[in-house]
Amino acid sequence: MPDFSIENEILKLKNNKECIIVGVDEVGYGSLAGPVVSAAVFFPNYNNETTQDINDSKKLTPKTRQKIYNKIITRVKWSIGFAHIFEIDEYNILNATHIAMKRALTGLNAHIDIDYVIIDGNKIPNIPWNAQAIIGGDTISTSIAAASIIAKVTRDRLMETLHIQYPQYNWNKNKGYGTKDHITSLYKYGKTIHHRNTFTPISKISYMFKNS
């Protein structure tokens, strides 16, 4: 289970001086449709019941994830950042993800003065704060794991809303990822404005419809 070992180690390096350490994670990197969503999270207290059961969002059932989300959003400082379809297509998915992360951090920094950022992954976006990238960070750091939960619940809700407009793609279940039913629907109905044109399945299907 994630804990605050990394956060506490950073505090030691700072001689235990007050240091606002923010965890960041994203959701939607590999999806064929919908935005990339990033969350930035700061825990004011590392030793309370708020942290119980927090884990990498991918390891939680939707019901458990929602329950933890409801608990933590009132007890931590957090912010969300989006990177939209046109940004994914124009700048590529990695750069768009970094845009979403920067937006989440900028939103949070408007309310607290960020000192240090820990990010899930192996790359650090161009941000004005000292930062550390941690591969598998959402399984190690509670701050990052909480960010993964908030980002996941936020994005899932968005895809469920879009499903109402485009029910044939089953986004309420696949959340825009390239599942068999999603691919089948793409070949049958074509793409929507919410699909990522630069992703191979979409570009292939677009070409097929254009030349049919």
From Swiss-Prot:
A divalent metal cation binds at residues 25-26, 120. It catalyses: Endonucleolytic cleavage to 5'-phosphomonoester. One of its GO terms (molecular function) is RNA-DNA hybrid ribonuclease activity. Pfam families: RNase_HII. GO terms for cellular component: cytoplasm; ribonuclease H2 complex. The keyword Metal-binding applies. The keyword Lipid metabolism does not apply. Keywords: Cytoplasm, Endonuclease, Hydrolase, Manganese, Metal-binding, Nuclease. PROSITE patterns: RNASE_H_2. Residues 19-212 form the RNase H type-2 domain. Its cofactor is Mn(2+); Mg(2+). Transmembrane segments: none annotated. CDD domains: RNase_HII_bacteria_HII_like. Its EC number is 3.1.26.4. Manganese or magnesium. Binds 1 divalent metal ion per monomer in the absence of substrate. May bind a second metal ion after substrate binding. One of its GO terms (biological process) is DNA replication, removal of RNA primer. Its main location: cytoplasm. It is found in: Cytoplasm. It comes from the Bacteria. PANTHER family: RIBONUCLEASE H2 SUBUNIT A, RIBONUCLEASE HII. HAMAP family: RNase_HII_B (MF_00052_B). NCBIfam families: PRK00015.1-3. Endonuclease that specifically degrades the RNA of RNA-DNA hybrids. Belongs to the RNase HII family. This is Ribonuclease HII. It comes from Ehrlichia ruminantium (strain Welgevonden). The lineage of its organism: Bacteria, Pseudomonadati, Pseudomonadota, Alphaproteobacteria, Rickettsiales.
